Amino acid sequence: EIIARYNFEEACFLIFFQLFERVGLYWQVGAVFPAQEHFVTNLFRQKLIAATDKLNIPATNKPGILFFLPENELHEMSLLFYSFLARKNGFNSFYLGQSVPFNDLVKISSQKEVDFVFTAFVNSILKEDLEDYLVQLKEVFPKQKIFITGHQVQEHSPKLPRNVKTIKDYQEFKKYLG
């Protein structure tokens, strides 16, 4: 019903992500237990993957974007949504998912040519560790623009290597997609 009222993109931003913020708060204060939060999250995850599949956009000559979450990062809803937006705009999306070991990124960088890299930092991380990770990521993907987002990025405002760009919200990312 919500998706019928809004388009899928608007429903995600206006309804679902607001719901996740509330569910997260309820979970933190003990009003919702983890299985309830996982149930809601996985329902939405299924809808998001199905919506991405329904796009049915053939491979194009548009740039490719590699989407991944760093090791031990499991919060993939925003990453899935950004991947959906990229696909919707005709970009080739290579979605690696959660908790990708850094050494795997090194291997992928030599095997798969991409134009952009996109990752998110939601789990707690020290500012210095975040900055070190970004420097290492820049070394692995020196020619690509790297987009980063997430609560930890906003909280720490890390010093960014020259090819790294912070994405504050989905409207800003859509501007890059054209």
Language-model-derived ranges and their functions:
Residues 39, 45-178:
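C-terminal regulatory/effector modules of DNA-binding transcriptional regulators
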